[in-house]
Amino acid sequence: MKINAFTTVSRRSFLAYCGGTAVAAAITMPSVMARGDVAPFRAGIACVDITPELPVSMVGGFRDRTATGVHDPLHARCIVLDNGEAQLALVMVDNCLIQRPVFEAAKKRIQEKTGLSPDRVLAAATHTHTGVTVTSVFQSDPVPGYADFLAERIAEAVDTAVKALEPAQIAWGSGAVPGEVFNRRWYMKDGTIPPNPFGATTDKVQMNPPRASENLVEPSGPTDPTVSILALRRPDGTPLAVLANYSLHYVGDTEAAVLSADYYGFFADKLASLMAPAASGKPFLAMMSNGTSGNINNVNFGEAGVAGPPYSRMSAVAESVANEVFQRYQQLEFQDTAVLASAMREITLGVRKPAGEDLERARAIVAAAEGPDMKTSEEVFARESILLADFPDAVPVPLQALRIGELGIAAIPCEVFVEIGLALRNESPFKNTFTIELANGYNGYLPTAEHHALGGYETWRARSSYLEVAAAEKIQETMQALLAQVKS
């Protein structure tokens, strides 16, 4: 079958591309009930193909890349919950970065189709670096027509779930996979960190340093090995859906010029295969959300690496995480219903814009570049400085919190540093809490103020990192308030 994202995927193709299991179930607005009646808890699932026609731009590098093949299809996966009084939808999209207007367009269509208001829909990118460009970052620009198509497909995923509701039971919990997450920002021996693209030698840490280098000192922060789990099953015990959350940036051992959902899609397929015997042929959906992984990846820099064939690391990570989720699933205590609540708040944050000598230097570098493509990191970030100079002085940032029973979910539209996710969990009013990053928009990296002082790639001023230094503190404070709001 030729994968064509601009046509409707048939049911047979849908089964083939979603782990071999039909995926659809739903939610409706609560109906009027007689006194004393209790509406059954219901959950719905859907999986929609978002793979584009080729060739197409792939975001995720300093230079644009063109995809000419597809290793595995891209999807928008959806879970919808209904307790008879409130409804929530969670959508995970196989993409690197999705700008807010795309999500807003999708949510507008969702409300028109289903009645679900925007605050009751959490939609996020997974952060695969082999997805389609829908947000301008570095030298990649949005693929014409794909943003509108993607918004429609996200809405279709929710609408499909809304139209196939079935009774369900719900549970939540967590496990741990410590062996697949590593902090990628390292302290190095004095004098061994290269100058940054702005010509300064002030960075105190280096992202992705040489592996097993004698110049390594120690990682600049922790990791979060937690795998959080939201699970749904039917009253007869057959599994219906699992949403997992893991703080791992992406894996990325793909072939060149090939689209892939990365380990997020591999995880969905692996868990579906593990669940298949228990599912007994009934629909089941697995999906992975990205936690707080702005400074985390899958590389153990303390050891020399051994290169494997393409996709081998993705497969290994997916298998490790899926096996842990599968084992923990067996221990979950399911219940017949759960409180559902949501809250959204928009805050305004300042932009770190270049000016004066910094901007003059950037213009001189770009003018001297052989172009039109910028080839060196100095040229790339000079171009970013020029583009960032046209940004407003402040930007709105949407924040969201969900309550699902005694589980709290924070949603932030940034590549969030792991310290922030750990703090939100520790300070949450819920026993179980996790954060989904890159949700409802894209506002670049979110380092803590302490990490801003250390410098390094994630702090370098660009369209990928532009929020004010105090942004993390302000976002964390607002998220704590939102979690408290949905808890009450």
What does each model-identified segment do?
Residues 29-31:
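N-terminal signal peptide c-region/cleavage motif recognized by signal peptidases
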